[in-house]
Amino acid sequence: MRPLVVAITARALFDLEDGHALFEREGLKAYAAYQREREDQPLQPGIAFPLVRKLLALNSLLPPGVPPVEVILLSRNSADTGLRIFNAIEHFGLGIVRAVFTSGADTHPYIQPFGAQLFLSA
C-alpha cells in the first residue's frame, strides 16, 4: 500500500501571520531575527493543523510498516528561520520528517517530485 502523501505549507500548518506582517513591514533581516529570537517558542496551530493531526493519527491505527499518510512540509523560509517551524513540529509531536526550505523561492516545483497527491496552503 502506498501512503497518501500530503504536502503542506508552513503558513497552513502554523500561524505565521505575526512574522509575515513583520516581513512585509520591515523586510527579511527583521523577519529572520524575529524567528531566531523565538526559535524555542512553539508556534500556534494554523488553519490546516487540525486536519494534519487527524491525518497523521491514522498512522497509529495500522501495524508498523508503511504509514498510510505522510505529510511533507514545503516552506519559503530558509533553513535558518525554519528551525522554529521544526521545533514546533517536534513540540506538537507531529510525524513530519521531510521538508523543503526554499529561502523565498516558489515551493510548487517540489510537489510532484515528492509524490504529493494533496497540497494544502493558506
Model-identified regions with their sequence ranges:
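Alpha-helical substrate-recognition element adjacent to the catalytic core
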Residues: 1-104
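Conserved Lys-Pro-Asp/Glu-containing loop-to-beta segment of HAD-superfamily phosphomonoesterases
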Residues: 109-122
